[in-house]
Amino acid sequence: QKTLIFGHKNPDTDTI
């Protein structure tokens, strides 16, 4: 399950 890391430049790829 992908959780978006808000505040990053690429919210589509910056996931945990």
From Swiss-Prot:
**Positions annotated to bind Mn(2+) 1:** H8, D12
Q: Which reaction does it catalyse?
A: diphosphate + H2O = 2 phosphate + H(+)
**What's in the GO CC field?**
cytoplasm
**Which free-text remark accompanies the cofactor?**
Binds 2 manganese ions per subunit.
GO MF terms here are: inorganic diphosphate phosphatase activity; metal ion binding
The UniProt record lists the EC number as 3.6.1.1
Q: Which family does it belong to?
A: Belongs to the PPase class C family.
The protein's name is Manganese-dependent inorganic pyrophosphatase
Q: Which organism is the protein's source?
A: Priestia megaterium
